[in-house]
Amino acid sequence: MHQDTVRGKAFAMPLISPAYPAGPYRFRNREYLIITYRTDPQKLRDLVPEPLQVCEPMVKFEFIRMPDSTGFGDYTEGGQVIPVSFYGRRGSYTHCMFLDDHPPIAGGRELWGFPKKLASPTLRTETDTLVGTLDYGPVRVATGTMGYKHRAADLASVRASLAEPNFLLKIIPHVDGTPRICELVEYHLEDVHLRGAWTGPAALNLWSHALAPVAELPVLEVVSAVHLVADLTLALGKVVHDYLAKA
């Protein structure tokens, strides 16, 4: 294969059959259970990378069901997102995500820098309760529950939240193990069609695990919960800070 052909075909690995296709990445009927809880502020400050700043001692534990996503298929995700500010702009920093599908793990890490690992999350309705779970191997590390559609949520507030910028710490090593890419990436959700959103009573339990350390941000108090369904496009990102650039 000629070098020009390699350069022309190069998008993702393997060259002849990439693990994921080029975008756009459209999601239909994407369902969220988002439980916001208060945690230890010092632990947050220890985990959130500068120049991001912790806004308040809150964490959002998200269980996300994605039955129809372009190129990525049908999968479920769970993890922790932290409200932050970036030079005065409010947004969210994705701390950790766990999912059950290889293409979005590979694509998420390589394109955007999502901190994704393989695990077994679920989101389902059990009679009158919306239930989210996260297992790492055979070990349960998170369970979230919420009363099913008890009250309609403020749609304007939900739309505003979905429109905020999102931030990721993208790290890709060089062949010698040193960091080749270490960047803060910003991305947005686009073309959002909010199908519905609801609130209700909620609970969240986290358990310690050496390789899925979600319990390192302990639940001190559940503050709120929202259940929403939306169609949206996951836009590609842009680099807003390069940790390897010389000052």
UniProtKB/Swiss-Prot annotation:
Query: Reaction catalysed?
Result: acetoacetate + H(+) = acetone + CO2
Alphabetized GO MF terms: acetoacetate decarboxylase activity
**Keywords carried by this UniProt record:** Decarboxylase, Lyase, Schiff base
Q: What is its EC number?
A: 4.1.1.4
Superkingdom: Bacteria
The record places the active site at 116 (schiff-base intermediate with acetoacetate)
Pfam families of this UniProt entry? ADC
The record's InterPro entries line, in alphabetical order, gives: Acetoacetate_decarboxylase (IPR010451), Acetoacetate_decarboxylase_bac (IPR023653), ADC_dom_sf (IPR023375)
Job of this protein: Catalyzes the conversion of acetoacetate to acetone and carbon dioxide.
As for family, the record states: Belongs to the ADC family.
User: Which protein are we looking at?
Assistant: Acetoacetate decarboxylase 1
Question: What is the originating organism of this protein?
Answer: Mesorhizobium japonicum (strain LMG 29417 / CECT 9101 / MAFF 303099)
Lineage, uppermost ranks: Bacteria, Pseudomonadati, Pseudomonadota, Alphaproteobacteria, Hyphomicrobiales
**Gene (UniProt):** adc1
